[in-house]
Amino acid sequence: MKKITVLHLDDCPYCHNAKRAVEELKAENLEYAKLDIEWIEESRQPELAKPYGKDYYYVPSIFIDGQKVYEAHPGESYEECLAAVEKAFKVACS
C-alpha cells in the first residue's frame, strides 16, 4: 500500500469533515481499515508540513506517495469530502 499523508489544522471544520470521512470509510471497508495515515498538524508540526508547502493552499490536503490527490476548498460539503477521501483511498490501495 502507498503512503498517505494528510495535512490539517485542529480547528478547521473541513479537516473535521475529513477525519469523520476517514473514520466512516475505515469502519465500512476492511481494506481501508488497513491503511496507515500520517496526520500532520501544520501549525504544530511545521517542519513536517514544509516539504508539502508549495503543493497546497487549503487544508485538509491528502498526499499519496508525495503527490497531492485532494485539497479541500471553501464551502465544500461533507459529501464532497467523503467522495474525495474515498477516491484517495482507492488510489492508495491500487
Go through each PLM region and give its residues.
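Extracytoplasmic thiol/disulfide redox context detector
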Residues: 1-5, 30-36, 93
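Hydrophobic beta-strand residues in large extracellular and virion-surface proteins
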Residues: 4-6, 37, 62-64, 85
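Non-catalytic, surface beta->alpha helical segment in thiol-disulfide oxidoreductase systems
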Residues: 58, 64-94
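Short alpha-helical
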Residues: 13, 44, 76
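Non-catalytic interaction surface on structured domains
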Residues: 18-22, 30, 64, 78-79
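Thiol-based oxidoreductase modules, predominantly thioredoxin-like and allied folds used
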Residues: 32-47
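Charged, often glycine-rich, active-site loop that binds/positions anionic groups
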Residues: 49-55
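Local sequence-structure signature of Cys/Sec-based thiol-disulfide redox active-site neighborhoods
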Residues: 1-28
